Amino acid sequence: MTVERMPSSLGGATSHGHLLELIRSADGLSRQQLLSTTGMSRATLYERLDTLTRRGYIYEAEPLTSTGGRPSRKIRFEDRGRVVLALTLGQTHGTVSITDTTGRQLRSKTFELEISAPADSVLAPLVDTGRKLLEQGTGETLLGIGVSLPAPVEAGSGHVKHQTTIPGWSPDSVVQAVKATWDLPLVIENDARAAALGERNSDAETVVYVKVGTGIGCGIVVEGSILRGAHGSAGDIGHIRMSADGPLCRCGRHGCLAAYSSGRALRDRLGHLGLAKPEDISAAAATGHPEVLQALADAADVLGRALAATVTTLNPDRLVLGGQIGALPGFVEKVSSRVLTDVVERIAEGMVVEAGHAEDLAACHGITTLVMRKIFAPEAVDQLFAEEADSAAG
């Protein structure tokens, strides 16, 4: 079982990378605060701060409040004018965002798409939109690009695996499309996993995020890190078999959870009402349509049965439901009721079941976090410094 740990540095707890991580995680620290926190000698600390400043990682900001004497100045992470390009794709729509280094959207555009269409027809407009949004900024520096997809993604390479959702795409379609335009750090992640990371309130939390849109996806975050599993398939709950003789799933088996509770399953059940998309179903539910409400209740009940096992296994702090179907108030309540009925009290004690933020916002925040970790994690910074030192030594 693999947990994608938050990176650790090659150089120890007082390396350049760890010092930058300490500064980046705070809202500014004085030199005295850094001396007290790190235990470093003044000479060593100041040398490393000078190096990080020269290389553009940090800067000295406004003075801290002082009760007397010379006011101290904050040492802050250099995030001014630095942005990330986030492409968050669902099965029927996508959002292109320019974010700051915390994942806050500065500019964005959302439009409809069909993820099963050929890769070029989906990705080319996204890349073009990203380029245009970047051109609207003034004096911004693009640090990297993050892409979230409704498909399994291989950690590290960013290659798409088991392409049921996007059958016409090659494993490296996304990598090629992005790298053809930007030669910058790139992170590609499953959409539910990115959203799970974006939904966490702190790195101490265990969060299970379930997206119910056209399909069903699940992301699991433990202590700030994505749980991937032995082969990268942790959280693929859509193909849990709920019944041997249930409805046919797209994977070819009968009775999968997705065949009962996904937006696609609801569309098949409610097709005679002309409800073709998840947003059509949610709109009909908002009007109180009795057949739609019953279908949603049935889907939520089956999903709750499956999630009871997930909750019992992981004992999360929060179970978050997202997606155009999953975040519907009545749907969340039905899932919560079934989960709390099926798990023992000590497992459910203190657990919060709730609707998430808008799915694009959660995934956008999560994918930005992953891009920032890739670039500025202690091990990444220390590795860069080590390589430069080796190169200088000749």
Regions inferred by a protein language model and the residue ranges of each:
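Glycine-rich phosphate-binding loop and adjoining helix at the ATP-binding site
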Residues: Q105-T206, G330-T341
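Short glycine-rich anion-binding loops that position phosphate/pyrophosphate groups of nucleotides
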Residues: L64, P150-V153, G213-G215, I325-G326
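Short glycine-aspartate micro-motif
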Residues: V84-T88, L142-G146, V207-K211, G217-G219
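ATP-binding/phosphotransfer module of carbohydrate and carboxylate kinases, centering on a glycine-rich
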Residues: M1-V127, R131-Q136, E140-T141, L257-G394
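Glycine/GP-enriched mid-protein hinge/lid loop-to-helix segment characteristic of carbohydrate kinases
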Residues: S108-T110, A117-V122, W169-P290, G394
